[in-house]
């Protein structure tokens, strides 16, 4: 069943307050944008991170802005589930937009639709198939994305005319311009579900890594890597994995030979694994918007306090191993 939002074409685009609303698709958010107009035209803040995050929008990290200009009324594109988040809006004109959730899980197949004019934008999470149909000539459809376009990016698709999704297009699909590629997309029953981003456990051959593997088990969304497969101290770590396909990194890797860390060779290895590696992972997580789980140790304190240590206590490491872990913290 399709849910259609009530936005008549004659509604004024002016005078709205910034507002973020949930929809029938989890994570798909509809946003009202304040538009300011006068005799010269109008102005809007199409994306303003501080205000919109405070209003409830995810703090996404856009890296590319695309614009699709459409000459004619009825131009119809979709449905494409892309491997990144999107922030869609229009700079001119108006569209009817529809989405189908293709993410693996209980919301697969959920549908939502609305009209987008210059006073409305929509946040589209990764794995939700996107489409639109122009309702005015010379419509400029614009969108921010959280990853750079690549010919190797993995998409999933569903047909615009799918009977299960039953999208109520304002202009019948047999009367509009659709590419042959879009006409050939599969029905929902044959669409490929988009799997969740993966969790990467680093240091899987170590004591902690083995324990995590025994606890978590083997799943499609879990990946385990040891030093032979992924050297976190390498300056090439940033390009060592398609990091946008991950959600979380659990760093279970560590140089834990406390006595050997006091030797010349051990100091080098301890600093590389414990400090440089952790710093490299932090850079990766910051660059790609990932969650990084870092494991500390009580060795970062000297043990002289008479009470239990807290996370905000001043670091006071004694040996090399402790110093490298404190540097990582």
Question: What is the meaning of each model-derived region?
Answer:
Residues 219-240:
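Adenosine-cofactor binding site in Rossmann-like domains, unifying the SAM/SAH pocket
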Residues 118, 126-145:
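Ligand-binding loop in jelly-roll beta-barrel domains
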